[in-house]
């Protein structure tokens, strides 16, 4: 096997500035939970979602359907979910998308707890005893953290596993497309916990499964919660390399 490649093969597909720009977009994407009171142009939202539809999809079935909410429509969803939250008082999940608080195994349990401590403890200065304040910030999930735009992403119910894989690629493309335009986002599984309220408010048909909500807007970098930051494991912790000896 030749150790050299033709120039047209070895040359990067993207010019270096484009590579640097893409890397900056990926590294700059964060789950933002504080938003400025600044509207996002409709054209920008449409552009983000139009680009997201270029995400890979098994057999090109494109199983996603997204609801875009602003103004009174977003407020109506927030009111509906919080009313359900206050009345039912417990989560009602459509499917078991993740374990309960005590069902996580290591190392995921430790990572999850570290995230919670960073968010509530270091960023907001709250202890486990600050029940009311922690509850206040948890409820902000259902107002999309005051973002001007809220998205609810759904996929076809069948075949659900395939559709959920497609949804992951679609959602990530939304997040990166938004970031490239100076917008911030937060993908939120919390809306799944009260899916009956979401489904009823938006008249989501039964053949669709709710995947997540997404907050979309411009970050309020002055809010204390904006200081929260997460880390990632080094590549050798999550990748097994099986290099060929000739590579």
UniProtKB/Swiss-Prot annotation:
The keyword Protein biosynthesis does not apply. PANTHER family: NAD(P)H NITROREDUCTASE YDGI-RELATED, NITROREDUCTASE. Keywords: Flavoprotein, FMN, NADP, Oxidoreductase. It catalyses: 4-nitrobenzoate + 2 NADPH + 2 H(+) = 4-hydroxylaminobenzoate + 2 NADP(+) + H2O. Belongs to the nitroreductase family. Optimum pH is 7.5. It comes from Nocardioides sp. (strain LMS-CY). Gene3D superfamilies: NADH Oxidase. Binds 1 FMN per subunit. The gene is pnbA. Pfam families: Nitroreductase. This is 4-nitrobenzoate reductase. Its cofactor is FMN. NADP(+) binds at residues 59, 112, 120, 126.
């Amino acid at each position: 096997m030749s150790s050299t490649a033709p120039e047209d093969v070895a040359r990067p597909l993207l010019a270096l500035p484009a590579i640097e720009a893409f890397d900056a977009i990926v590294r700059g994407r964060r789950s933002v939970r504080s938003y400025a009171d600044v509207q996002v142009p409709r054209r920008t939202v449409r552009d983000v979602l139009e680009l997201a539809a270029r995400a890979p999809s098994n057999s090109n079935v494109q199983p996603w359907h997204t609801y875009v909410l602003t103004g009174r429509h977003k407020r109506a969803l927030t009111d509906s979910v919080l009313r359900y939250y206050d009345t039912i008082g417990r989560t009602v999940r459509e499917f078991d998308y993740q374990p309960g608080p005590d069902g996580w195994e290591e190392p995921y349990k430790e990572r999850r707890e570290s995230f919670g401590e960073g968010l509530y403890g270091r960023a907001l200065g709250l202890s486990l005893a600050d029940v009311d304040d922690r509850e206040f910030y948890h409820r902000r999930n259902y107002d999309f953290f005051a973002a001007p735009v809220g998205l609810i992403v759904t996929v076809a119910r069948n075949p659900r596993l395939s559709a959920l894989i497609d949804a992951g690629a679609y959602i990530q493309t939304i997040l990166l497309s938004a970031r490239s335009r100076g917008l911030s986002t937060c993908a939120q599984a919390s809306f799944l916990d009260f899916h009956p309220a979401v489904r009823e408010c938006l008249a989501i048909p039964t053949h669709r499964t709710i995947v997540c909500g997404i907050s979309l807007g411009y970050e309020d970098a002055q809010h204390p919660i904006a200081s929260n930051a997460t880390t990632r494991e080094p590549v050798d912790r999550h990748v097994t390399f099986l290099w060929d000896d000739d590579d």
